Amino acid sequence: ILNFISWSNEVEDMHFLVQKEVAEKINGSLGTKNWGKLSIKLSAFFHTQILFDVPPESFDIKPKVDSSFIRLIPKTDVVDSSTKDKFFKIIDMSFASRRKNIKNNLKKANLNWSELGIDQNLRPEEVSLENYLKIAKHYRE
């Protein structure tokens, strides 16, 4: 699904049938266990919705999991291409050790936390999309 980010300017919306747990991760919100790499990356480019659940009985060959039908609606204020790669790298580095705070996970990024105005003692799932975008803009490789 992340590969569709490059097409976000060319579509009105996209629909997918995915495993229910994946849908919950895609649609995760700040401060929850589902606010992770996938939900943060997608939320920078799309509004996400779980439209409805699909039970195993809906399939000829019943899967052992529930499914959900999701909708992704592209955002107009998309992250520019020069920031996208840095943004993805910051997200990946932040979640390298989910139990550590972002200061420890982003140690190699050499960030000035006081200049950013972000609490460096937050865990990755406690950092907002806006703050991740701010970190990415200040990140120098």
Regions found by a protein language model. Name each.
Residues 1-129, 134, 140:
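Class I S-adenosyl-L-methionine
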